[in-house]
Regions:
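Flexible, glycine/charged-enriched surface loops at secondary-structure junctions
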Residues: 1-5
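C-terminal amphipathic alpha-helical interaction region
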Residues: 12-207
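Single-stranded nucleic-acid nicking/binding segments centered on His-rich, glycine/basic loops
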Residues: 7-11
Length: 207
């Protein structure tokens, strides 16, 4: 009977290989712990995954079946490194441009409006503490944004001078990407409190 045979085969496979099945969240810390327990590598990024292409085990495997030679694998790894570096470079420069030419000028303009509002409310003899607090918060985040922008500009420029390939792509991953995240943090906070009419681009809510 075909169905019986299939069920029997499935049962056999499940019994033999149950230990490799993980039904939890593969993106959670639970999987990180489980992978370590099983002796599996926890590769967190593309840059850290590329070297797997040129390990002795990979070279032997692809060579054994006539898929790729060692030189071909090394060439593919090099291309992946270069593509990654180019992609992050484009993203970093776009981020710098948006922050410098759109976000910071818009926030500067808004802080002036807030400052004028604080003065007007005080002159009217009313409590301007809320407006003053908003102004202080936004000014603080604006300072953080400018500092983060300078850092991103510096590391992006430094990355351009690195040796192309593995060295450069690793620098982009371990230095430029964190600097990008460092710029995004205060900008995200600003987006939550700056007047929507002033913000120069669609918000997460709009999207």
């Amino acid at each position: 009977d075909f169905d019986t045979a299939v069920h029997s085969l499935i049962k056999e496979y499940l019994t033999d290989h149950q230990r490799i099945i993980f039904n939890g969240n593969g993106y959670s810390d639970e999987w990180v712990a489980e992978a370590e327990k099983r002796g599996l590598p926890n590769i967190k990024s593309m840059v850290e995954a590329i070297p797997a292409l040129t390990t002795e085990k990979a070279v032997d495997l692809f060579g054994k079946f006539g898929v790729f030679t060692k030189a071909e694998l090394e060439s593919r790894a090099e291309i992946k490194y270069e593509n990654y570096a180019k992609a992050i470079n484009i993203e970093a420069k776009a981020m710098i441009d948006i922050a410098a030419k759109q976000i910071i000028p818009a926030v500067v303009k808004y802080t002036k409006e807030l400052a004028d509002t604080v003065l007007a409310v005080k002159e009217a003899g009313a409590d301007a503490s809320v407006q003053a607090e908003m102004l202080a918060d936004i000014s603080g985040l604006l300072t953080e944004t400018k500092a983060a922008l300078k850092k991103l500009e510096a590391v992006t420029e430094e990355a351009a001078g690195k040796e192309e390939g593995k060295v450069q792509s690793e620098f982009y991953h371990f230095s430029v990407v964190p600097a990008m995240e460092g710029l995004r943090t205060p900008v995200d906070e600003l987006e939550m409190i700056v007047d929507k009419e002033v913000w120069p681009m669609p918000s997460y809510g709009d999207l």
